[in-house]
Amino acid sequence: DFGAWFDSRYGQQFTGRKGSDIRTDLYVTVEEAFFGARKDIYVGMGKIEFEVAPGLSNGSTHRVTGRGQKGSTPELNGDLIVKISYLRHHQFEVRGVDFHTTMKISLPTAAIGGSEYVQVLEEKIKIKIKPGTQPDTTLRVQGKGMMTRVGLRGDLYIKIRVEIPTSLSSIERDFFEKMQAGLT
């Protein structure tokens, strides 16, 4: 064995060459990060199946030991460093463990209250709109955000957008004129 020969010849242990680490980005959907998934990563000539555990956070890095560049022995192979990056979601933005979205409501709903529904991944959530809700009001729904590694959930934040009608029927116009006259 070369290492033993080298040790006997020069009086020190031959340690060999460690392979370099390989860094890669793994792009996952919010759903994959929330529920968990298996993703294939192609490195060099090989494929590695990577377990996306539920609650992996955006920007987090994970080390897969021995799956980087080859070393002089298998024990000296480098590691694969995987950085998790969320793909943009069509419905909401993920900030930390919280979901942020907007909801359009009608002017009458803003004035007298009501309820609307918002879809968040696995469920449809009923949102109560209080009478007198102002444009750009932000509502918070606890425990309806992103899953964390320990099984807890962040919050859902909903920014209210009040839709102002661009065309009115004669009845609607009459109603708003009477309402305006009553306010002055």
Positions of PLM-derived features:
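Post-J-domain flank of DnaJ/Hsp40 co-chaperones
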Residues: 1-42, 72-75, 183-184
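Intrinsically disordered, low-complexity linker/assembly segments
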Residues: 47, 51-184
